Regions:
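Active-site core of glycosidic bond-cleaving carbohydrate-active enzymes
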Residues: 25, 47, 51-53
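Active-site-adjacent helix-turn-beta-strand microarchitecture at beta-sheet edges
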Residues: 60
Length: 308
């Protein structure tokens, strides 16, 4: 099963009864007035967004972290560059410049979130709180190209919501096995290879472990309390994060790992996309002025003197 089929099967269809991976799911129905707003909320911003540390956690297709020698990382001047040759879950579930927003004929002309200068639909620079993406890394998981579900904010979503699937069970086993024994048995190894294969990542997880430098990993799951974990355990946690993000489990994981404790001793400043090297050019107004970034209450992006 490919990552693309993950999206098609359990992220973008109303019934999930015929999807073996999904063990428990919630059904929605416009006829029963049980609907949601996820399609529209992933189409526009939702006053949220993934952090730079999160996107950096995804491996390259060759299994190496982005900072490792020979990784092939293309940098972060554009969102498409960030996603290039990476774990296919990052490619699929985070919006980039080349992703079309509307392809359903009912929507009219196909559009993109990040397009040519003056022709962008991105919600990075809007001052409207409920439709802005505050980091530039806009979530795309559960988006559907069925325009009837995303034409407005009137709770038109009817696609099903997976609650528990076999991938989570596999990750649970991997983590428990390593925490209990300090090693991975044949079953855990097989699960890990299967998850990586489906994500388009080299199945040799030892390549990743050997190339991991915890001092260059910006994610909280590096820590249990304020103590760094082993590179093996961190990579098991990385796999869990990269597989299950946007599925409502992240906060619980960080709590049970006591990863938030690190903030008791170290300041944490969330970072977003690299805006000021290249991306800003798509947000100039007709006079060539960049978005307001002077630190005042109505500024819409951070100053280029403080960040990229």
């Amino acid at each position: 099963t490919t990552t693309a089929s993950i999206s098609q099967k359990f992220c973008t269809q109303p019934p999930l009864a015929d999807v073996p991976e999904v063990l428990l799911w919630r059904q929605y129905s416009s006829a029963l007035s049980i609907t949601h707003d996820v399609p529209m909320r992933t189409k526009v911003g939702c006053n949220d967004g993934f952090t730079r540390a999160f996107t950096q956690s995804f491996l390259m297709a060759n299994g190496k972290p982005i900072y490792a020698a020979g990784s092939g990382y293309q940098g972060d001047n554009t969102l498409d560059a960030v996603k290039s040759n990476r774990d296919e879950r990052l490619q699929l579930f985070v919006w980039g410049e080349s992703n079309k927003v509307d392809t359903d004929p009912a929507a009219g002309k196909p559009r993109k979130l990040y397009a040519a200068p003056g022709d962008t639909l991105s919600y990075i620079t809007t001052s409207v709180v409920e439709t802005r993406c505050i980091t530039g890394y806009q979530p795309r998981k559960y988006y559907t190209y069925d325009y009837a579900q995303s034409m407005n904010d009137e709770l038109r979503g009817t696609n099903a919501c997976p609650i528990f699937r076999t991938a989570e069970a596999m990750l649970n086993y991997m983590e428990a096995c390593y925490e209990l024994t300090g090693a991975l048995d044949a079953t855990a190894q097989g699960y890990w290879k299967a998850l990586r294969k489906r994500a388009g990542v080299d199945t040799n997880y030892q390549t990743t472990i050997d190339a991991t430098d915890l001092s260059q990993e910006g994610d909280w799951s590096v820590y249990s309390g304020t103590t760094p974990v082993s590179t093996t355990l961190y990579n098991i946690r990385r796999e869990r994060m990269n597989e299950l993000f946007s599925e409502g489990l992240r906060y619980q994981d960080l709590i049970r790992w006591r990863s938030f404790d690190k903030m008791l001793t170290t300041k944490w400043i969330p970072e977003g996309a690299n805006f000021w090297d290249e991306m800003y050019k798509s947000y100039l107004d007709k006079k060539g002025n960049a978005p307001k970034a002077d630190g005042t209450a109505d500024a819409v992006v951070s100053s280029k003197d403080l960040s990229k």
